[in-house]
Amino acid sequence: MNFTPTKYSLVCCADGHRFEDTGWCLADPQCGCPSLVRAEYEKKQYEPREDLDGFYRYADWLPVQRTLNGSGTPVTYRSTGLAAELGLENLYITFSGWWPEKGAKMTTCSFKETEAYSVCGRLCADNRKILVVASAGNTARAFAKVCSENNIPLLISIPADNIGAMWFSKPLNDCVKIIASPEGSDYYDAIVLSDKVCTDPAFMAEGGAKNVARRDGIGTTLLTAV
């Protein structure tokens, strides 16, 4: 189906300056101090999109240019067993992972898929730069899965000691590559390595928490409960 990009503006959290997203803004270029930016969506009333599948049911409140294949969503359900144990009548649990009996079908078993599908959906389809993500495990696995299944060029930087976290249900597409900081290093070393890679104009930093798509993506965890 033809998807119309979500309409939104970016707002600087430091001074309230509103501006348009030029495609991959991680900060307000006019702000004189470090600050996050947030998205304000044209559609104010929250309604899941019945015409879209999986994660993109929440596209009206996601800064996305397109939808991608293979997404799942968190699932919110009313607890019985734990609620009874705790003596609660209205306990609801939100689950992110693989539990098909409940409708949860995140094949990496990680809530980080909500971030990956949002960030990668923010990328224009004609983007030619290689996305760079630094991670200690879960984030890398989620981005690798999403990019592999949707032919998005990706370079992952992880600590060598965390290579065991990089398991997948099927082989990765060649568009995904992995580099590692030396044994004995940690997540911060992987970040430094990714920063060095991004000095080459062929690569682009994903941005981590500075990327509004990350934060709004994980916010869908709450939307599933509404």
Which residue ranges define each predicted feature?
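PLP-dependent amino-acid enzyme catalytic core
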Residues: M1-V226
